[in-house]
Each structure stands twice: as structure tokens, then as C-alpha cells.
């Protein structure tokens, strides 16, 4: 599907493996508890600084969440002393507060030189936003070569659109030099809307063509209206350009709204068919609609059309279809392909599938034995070495959900469970709060167990009836 740059990545750290240095987590935890209990700011900062002084890198994620746009002084204390994390988060702070771009770039380059490979992804994103894709790819390749998964994804995505992006660069230079003609201007705006999904920039270029009812210009206007919570006005525009021009992106918007609001799959499919488009966004969504209509062969055919054009997002849908149809090998193969192209979601899916296969193998092995051994507490620990390796990579790339999942690969009471869930809790992951509650419950630490379980519940996690009673007593 079309590419969107989500700033959720801004607080995704490149975290070191949990088997490495564990210093600073006691202070980090005190700081975390202080934040959740709304303790004095001086006490909280003291704990965060102590953790950072002990070379703990996760604390910078917590500081970023807690301090927000007030964190510059904190980051300044640890410049050149934190393997690039202070520089990284100061750059994020400046980005949030509209700081000077040159300073942001210098900080990120310094961060990368100190070993924080996540900075390469952010540098690539900055140049992508300026339509300087060649420069972006230089940074993303460095991140990719270092194994930074978001760089891997973006590099492969951009590589798939190399010709388009080269043309955008060429035309954008003409726009800046004021040597672009109207035909080229229309082409540039259209490419930015359709291939980059940057509606504001695309609209700024295409608004001169609104008077001629140019579909991409009207579409960009409608997308901006939606961002302004003017959905009815946007839908009117989608209807207009679909009825008059069968514009494929308008058709996609209308079809997706039909599915979301009324589950009218038949009408949605008619709209998609009427676009007469073979763009991945259309064929991929057709696959989704056919799957919901239980026409699985047609779903597969349309998913494959998008996958053949290297649409990484649709690979996940195709893998899920194969899983639901019991075609495990096909599911594993497509998830593996998407994961190697940088998809975090594919990594999740693949790890879950590998674990399920491992559990089934163990179950079959036990069933074939005459005498089943008494169940051991270690039986609850997840077993797949392949799945664990994938999750370790996702943790290394700063994904908090993988931190939580990886903690399930350690036996009850293992200190790695605490460390992994503290990493995720530093990003306010509610499952991590619950897991910490259970960890301390098993350690007979009633105070901390109740504290984390209450926090998990307050953040919407279902802690179950047993722990509901426990925290009340």
C-alpha cells in the first residue's frame, strides 16, 4: 500500500540486546515509578540522570516521554556521553519545537557516528521530506547495512520506486529554480500525491489546476479536509472525481469507507472494479474485500498482483490469508520475505507462526511417548529458537511490543523478564506494566506487584479477576 511516514518511530530506540550491560535499571525503575506516582520533579530527574550516568540507554526514551519539549537541558548533560542517544533525542526535541534543520542534521550525524543506527533512518526521513531521495538513500543504506530495520524497510520501498523518485527530484529542482513548465508542474504534483502521499505539498503544487477539476488536485484537497475533520466535504469530492473520472484513489477512499461503515463488500468491489486500475493500492484492497467475501482464490490472486510489485504491506495480508487457509509453508515464506525487506509486522507474524509450529512439534513428540512426564514450570516458556532470534532483532531495533513478547522466552523469575519489561515500560507499554506486576508477584514483592498491576489496569489492561481481588486486599 502507499507509504506513510509515522512519527511513532520518533521514540523507537535502537536498544542493546538484553544480554548486554544491565546497569542503570534500578534508577530507571525508580524514575518510572516516580513519574507514575507524580512525585517531585527534582527526585525524578535525579533518578533519570543517575540511570543515564550509568550508561543506560533506555532512560532516554523515558526522559523523552516525561520531559517532552522541556528536555533540552537533560540531553545537553549527556552529549558525547551516551553512545549518541542524547544527540538523537535532542534532535527529536528540536524537530518537535521547529528547531534549525542544520542543527538537527548535525546532531543525528553525531548520533550515528557514536553507534546509534536509528539516526540513519531519521536522517533519511528528513531528506525524503525534502524530496532529496538520492541523499535519503545514502543514509538509509548505511542504516540498512547496520541492520536498522526501519532503514531496511524505507530503503527497499524507495528502491522499488527509484525511477519515480528520480523524476520527482528532477522536477522538484526545476520547481525550486523556477524553470518548470505547467505540464511538468502537474506531473510533479501528481507524483507527490500518488507516490509519496504528501498531500499538503502536492496540493500546494496542484492548486493552480483546481479550476480545471484535475482529479489529483481535488483528491489532495479532500485529504486535507479529512485531516481538518471535514469528512462530509471530503466524501463529496471523492464522489465527484470518482463519478466523473473513475479516479483510482477516490475509488479506494469510497470503497474503504463502504467497508468500514457498513461492511458493504459487494458495492465496495464494484467501485474498485470501476476504477479499472492495476495500482497495488487497488489490487491489494480488492484482495482484502474478496477475503472478507470468503472468495479466497480471488483474494489470493489480487494480493499476488500487489506482491508482484513488491508491496510489502500486502505481503502481510497474503501471509495471514495463507495462515487462515492452513497453508503454513506459504505463510512462512511470504512473512520471511517481508521481514527481510524490513517489515516489523512481518517479524511479529513470523515469530508467532514459528512458535506455533514449535509448540505443535513438541506436543506431537509428547503424544508419541508412552509416559508423559509431569508438567514442569518451564513448559510455559516459549521454545522456538528461530522466533526468539527474530524478536531479539526487533528488540535491538527498539520495538517495545517485541520486548514484551521476548520476555516470554525466559523462565519464571529470570532477571531478563524484568529488564525487557522495564525497557517497554519506559515507553509506557501497558502490557509491560502488567508483566512487571506478575514478575514482582512471583518474587513476593507485594508493594511493587500491586503498584504495577494497578497501573496496568488504569491504562486499560485487563488484569483478570484473581489480580483484581489481589490489588484490593
In which residue ranges do the predicted regions lie?
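Single-residue signature of alpha-solenoid repeat helices
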Residues: 44, 71, 104, 136, ...
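Hydrophobic/aromatic packing residues within the alpha-helices of TPR/SEL1-like helical repeat arrays
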Residues: 48, 75, 108, 140, ...
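Terminal, low-structured helical/coil segments at or just beyond the last alpha-helical repeat
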Residues: 374, 447-473
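Short helix-capping/linker turns of helical repeat alpha-solenoids
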Residues: 54-57, 81-84, 114-116, 146-149, ...
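Position-specific recognition of the canonical hydrophobic site in helix A of tetratricopeptide repeat
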Residues: 35, 95, 128, 160, ...
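Residue-level recognition of tetratricopeptide repeat
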Residues: 32, 64, 92, 125, ...
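Canonical tetratricopeptide repeat
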Residues: 61-62, 89, 122, 154, ...
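Residue-level detector of the short coil/turn that links helix A to helix B
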Residues: 38-39, 70, 98-99, 131, ...
Amino acid at each position: 500500500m502507499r507509504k506513510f511516514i509515522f512519527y511513532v518511530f520518533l521514540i523507537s530506540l535502537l536498544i542493546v540486546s538484553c544480554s548486554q550491560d544491565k546497569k542503570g535499571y534500578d534508577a530507571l525503575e525508580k524514575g518510572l515509578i516516580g513519574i507514575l506516582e507524580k512525585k517531585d520533579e527534582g527526585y525524578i530527574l535525579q533518578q533519570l540522570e543517575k540511570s543515564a550516568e550509568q550508561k543506560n540507554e533506555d532512560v532516554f526514551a523515558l526522559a523523552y516521554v516525561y520531559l517532552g519539549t522541556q528536555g533540552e537541558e537533560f540531553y545537553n548533560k549527556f552529549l558525547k556521553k551516551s553512545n549518541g542517544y542524547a544527540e538523537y533525542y535532542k534532535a527529536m526535541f528540536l524537530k518537535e519545537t521547529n528547531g534549525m534543520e542544520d542543527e538537527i542534521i548535525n546532531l543525528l550525524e553525531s548520533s550515528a557516528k557514536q553507534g546509534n543506527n536509528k539516526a540513519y533512518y531519521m536522517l533519511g526521513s528528513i531528506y525524503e521530506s525534502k524530496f532529496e531521495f538520492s541523499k535519503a538513500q545514502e543514509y538509509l543504506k548505511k542504516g540498512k547495512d547496520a541492520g536498522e530495520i526501519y532503514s531496511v524497510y524505507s530503503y527497499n520501498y524507495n528502491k522499488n520506486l527509484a525511477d519515480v523518485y528520480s523524476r520527482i527530484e528532477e522536477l522538484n529542482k526545476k520547481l525550486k529554480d523556477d524553470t518548470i513548465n505547467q505540464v511538468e508542474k502537474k506531473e510533479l504534483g501528481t507524483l507527490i500525491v500518488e507516490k509519496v502521499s504528501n498531500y499538503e505539498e502536492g496540493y500546494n503544487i496542484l492548486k493552480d489546476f483546481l479550476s480545471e477539476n484535475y482529479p489529483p488536485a481535488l483528491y489532495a484537497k479532500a485529504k486535507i479536509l479529512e485531516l481538518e475533520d471535514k469528512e462530509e466535504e471530503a466524501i463529496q469530492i471523492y464522489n465527484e472525481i470518482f463519478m466523473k473520472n473513475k479516479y483510482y484513489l477516490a475509488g479506494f477512499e469510497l470503497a474503504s469507507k463502504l467497508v468500514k461503515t457498513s461492511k458493504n463488500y459487494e458495492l465496495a468491489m464494484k467501485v474498485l472494479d470501476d476504477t479499472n486500475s492495476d495500482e497495488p493500492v487497488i489490487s491489494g484492497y480488492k484482495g482484502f474485500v474478496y477475503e472478507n467475501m470468503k472468495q479466497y482464490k480471488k483474494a489470493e490472486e489480487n494480493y499476488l498482483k500487489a506482491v508482484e510489485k513488491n508491496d510489502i504491506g500486502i505481503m502481510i495480508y497474503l501471509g495471514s490469508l495463507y495462515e487462515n487457509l492452513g497453508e503454513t509453508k506459504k505463510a512462512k515464506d511470504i512473512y520471511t520475505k517481508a521481514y527481510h525487506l524490513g517489515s516489523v509486522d512481518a517479524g511479529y507474524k513470523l515469530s508467532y507462526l514459528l512458535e506455533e509450529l514449535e509448540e505443535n512439534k513438541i506436543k506431537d513428540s509428547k503424544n508419541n511417548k508412552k509416559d508423559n512426564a509431569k508438567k514442569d514450570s518451564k513448559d510455559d516458556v516459549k521454545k522456538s529458537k528461530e522466533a526468539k532470534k527474530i524478536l531479539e532483532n526487533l528488540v535491538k531495533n527498539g520495538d517495545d511490543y517485541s520486548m514484551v513478547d521476548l520476555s516470554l522466552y525466559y523462565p519464571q523469575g529470570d532477571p531478563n523478564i524484568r529488564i525487557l519489561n522495564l525497557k517497554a515500560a519506559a515507553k509506557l507499554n501497558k502490557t509491560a506494566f502488567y508483566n512487571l506486576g506478575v514478575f514482582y508477584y512471583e518474587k513476593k514483592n507485594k508493594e511493587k506487584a500491586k503498584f504495577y498491576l494497578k497501573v496496568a489496569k488504569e491504562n486499560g489492561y485487563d488484569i483478570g479477576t484473581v489480580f483484581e481481588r489481589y490489588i484490593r486486599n
